Every structure is written in C-alpha cells, then in structure tokens.
C-alpha cells in the first residue's frame, strides 16, 4: 500500500508540474499557451542608455507582474484645505490652483496687512451719530454767539443814533448871529435818518432779546430774515448819504464864515452818525449770514 501511495503522489506532482496551467510552465517552451504576445510599448531598437544592473529591473518587473499578492498602492498625499478667502482679499483673475506655497503666503500676508490698515483707518473715523451730534452742538454755539453779537450791535446803534439826532436837534444859537439846524435841508435830512434808524434799531434790539429768551421772533414770519437784511442795507446807505450831505454843508459854512458853536455841534452830530453807519454795516453782514445760512439749511 505504501508503494502505491508514493507512486500516486509522485504522479500527481508530475502531472501538476507538466500541466499547462502551472505557473512554472508559463514561460517554458513546453507551455501550451506559447509565447506571450509582445507588448506594443516595447521599442524595436535597443535602448541607447547602458543599464548597469538589469537584474534589478527584471526582478522588479517580475515582482510587480507575477506577485500573487496585490501591489501596495501608496497612500494619497494629504489634502491641505485652501486658506479661507478674506473679505478684502484681492485675487488676480489669472491665478491658478497650482501656485507655490510661498507665493500664497505672500498673497495672504499682503491681504492681512491691507485689512489691518483698513481696520485702523475705520476705527479712528467717527460714527454718523457722533458726527451729527457734534455738528449740532457746534451750530448751536455758533448761533448763540451770532445772536449775542447782533444784540450788542443793535444796542450800539440805538445809543449812537439817539446821540446823533439829539445833538443835531439841540443845534441852535441865539442872538443877532443865531442860527438853527431847521434852516438847512442837509441837517434836517441827517436828523430824520437818525430818528428812523433809532426806531428801527430799538425794535430790532427788542426782537433779538426776545429770540434769545424764547427762541422766537416778535415778528415771526417767513420773510423775517429777508426783511432785516433789506432794512439794514437801506439804513446803512441812508446814514452814509445823510452824514455826507451834512458834512458838505458844514465844510461850506466853515470855508465862508469860519468855525463857531453852531458848526461844532453839527460836526459832532455828523461824526456820531458816521459811527452809527459803521454799526449798521456790521448788522447788515450778520443779517446776510443768517439769511443765507437758514436758506441753505
């Protein structure tokens, strides 16, 4: 029995080795499959380069082609997520995904610096609410200063006009050489203009005081600023005209008859009238400022 089992095992081993399905006969000339078809990637000419160790190449090919185990696949490279695009980043249109890491680092640092500059610049800028509140406070202070200045010049006009027409009204002399202001139209003209200017300036002084106390005018109408501006301009021109006419008459009197008490009082009244003209000129500037400021707002 032992002889038969040994013979059968040898015959099985021999038949397996002689089988065309055996891997040992794959490249054998006795293989039924014959030669392998020649690969289309094999160059018909010899390689121009000298191979120093051809066995390593053959062994590698055999290991890759005839290994019963699956070939180990190298793990894929770790994927680095792209950097998050910042809000103010400026990416050029022709930028590609295969940029080098160094260039991307430079790009990100440039964007980061730009973002810091924008943040610093915006942090120092005031908000809209703060800016409007500051503007309102400055405007209120400026209006208060203008109101106080206007009231001061109105009081000055009242004082100067009353002094001017009082001196002119008292300019009378007695005796054989006596004279009076009412005999000359230039003096009457100067007196009348100073009286009108006194009445108007007194009314405007009360109006300015009422505005400072109640923040409303005595004559509260839509054309108040236009009326005040027009009256200031008109009375300033009238005072200049009346004072100039009276000064011409005094000069003519002095050149013909010399100086006396009558001409000296007339000269004093005319000088104060010129000062009143200066006060009205400043009031005209203030009223024009108010007119155009309120019109623009």
Curated annotation (Swiss-Prot):
<keyword id="KW-1133">Transmembrane helix</keyword>
<dbReference type="GO" id="GO:0005886">
    <property type="term" value="C:plasma membrane"/>
</dbReference>
<keyword id="KW-1003">Cell membrane</keyword>
<comment type="subunit">
    <text>Homodimer and heterodimers.</text>
</comment>
<dbReference type="Pfam" id="PF04535">
    <property type="entry name" value="CASP_dom"/>
</dbReference>
<feature type="topological domain" description="Extracellular">
    <location>
        <begin position="171"/>
        <end position="189"/>
    </location>
</feature>
<feature type="region of interest" description="Disordered">
    <location>
        <begin position="1"/>
        <end position="136"/>
    </location>
</feature>
<dbReference type="InterPro" id="IPR006702">
    <property type="entry name" value="CASP_dom"/>
</dbReference>
<feature type="topological domain" description="Cytoplasmic">
    <location>
        <begin position="211"/>
        <end position="225"/>
    </location>
</feature>
<feature type="transmembrane region" description="Helical">
    <location>
        <begin position="226"/>
        <end position="246"/>
    </location>
</feature>
<feature type="compositionally biased region" description="Low complexity">
    <location>
        <begin position="8"/>
        <end position="19"/>
    </location>
</feature>
<keyword id="KW-0472">Membrane</keyword>
<feature type="transmembrane region" description="Helical">
    <location>
        <begin position="190"/>
        <end position="210"/>
    </location>
</feature>
<keyword id="KW-0812">Transmembrane</keyword>
<comment type="similarity">
    <text>Belongs to the Casparian strip membrane proteins (CASP) family.</text>
</comment>
<protein>
    <recommendedName>
        <fullName>CASP-like protein 4A2</fullName>
    </recommendedName>
</protein>
<feature type="topological domain" description="Cytoplasmic">
    <location>
        <begin position="1"/>
        <end position="149"/>
    </location>
</feature>
<feature type="transmembrane region" description="Helical">
    <location>
        <begin position="150"/>
        <end position="170"/>
    </location>
</feature>
<feature type="topological domain" description="Extracellular">
    <location>
        <begin position="247"/>
        <end position="265"/>
    </location>
</feature>
<feature type="topological domain" description="Cytoplasmic">
    <location>
        <begin position="287"/>
        <end position="297"/>
    </location>
</feature>
<feature type="transmembrane region" description="Helical">
    <location>
        <begin position="266"/>
        <end position="286"/>
    </location>
</feature>
<feature type="compositionally biased region" description="Pro residues">
    <location>
        <begin position="69"/>
        <end position="83"/>
    </location>
</feature>
<feature type="compositionally biased region" description="Polar residues">
    <location>
        <begin position="93"/>
        <end position="121"/>
    </location>
</feature>
């Amino acid at each position: 029995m032992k002889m038969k089992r040994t013979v059968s095992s040898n015959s099985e081993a021999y038949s397996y080795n002689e089988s065309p399905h055996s891997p040992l006969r794959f490249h054998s000339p006795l293989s039924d499959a014959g030669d392998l078809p020649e690969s289309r990637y094999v160059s018909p000419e010899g390689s121009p380069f000298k191979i120093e160790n051809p066995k390593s190449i053959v062994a590698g090919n055999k290991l890759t082609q005839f290994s019963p185990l699956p070939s180990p696949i190298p793990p894929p490279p770790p994927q680095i997520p792209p950097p998050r695009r910042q809000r103010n980043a400026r990416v050029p249109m022709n930028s590609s995904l295969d940029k080098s890491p160094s260039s991307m680092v430079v790009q990100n640092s440039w964007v980061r610096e730009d973002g810091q500059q924008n943040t610093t610049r915006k942090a120092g800028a005031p908000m809209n609410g703060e800016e409007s509140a500051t503007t309102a406070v400055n405007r209120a202070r400026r209006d208060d200063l203008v109101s106080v200045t206007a009231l001061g010049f109105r009081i000055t006009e009242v004082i100067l006009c009353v002094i001017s027409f009082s001196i002119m009204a008292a300019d009378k002399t007695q005796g054989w050489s006596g004279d009076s202001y009412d005999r000359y139209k230039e003096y009457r003209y100067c007196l009348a203009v100073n009286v009108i200017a006194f009445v108007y300036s007194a009314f405007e002084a009360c109006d300015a005081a009422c505005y400072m106390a109640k923040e409303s005018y005595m004559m509260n109408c839509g054309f108040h600023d236009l009326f005040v501006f027009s009256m200031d301009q008109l009375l300033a021109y009238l005072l200049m005209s009346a004072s100039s006419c009276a000064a011409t008459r005094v000069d003519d009197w002095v050149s013909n008859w010399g100086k006396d008490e009558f001409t000296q009082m007339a000269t004093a009244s005319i000088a104060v009238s010129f000062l009143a003209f200066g006060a009205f000129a400043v009031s005209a500037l203030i009223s024009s400022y108010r007119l155009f400021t309120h019109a623009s707002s």
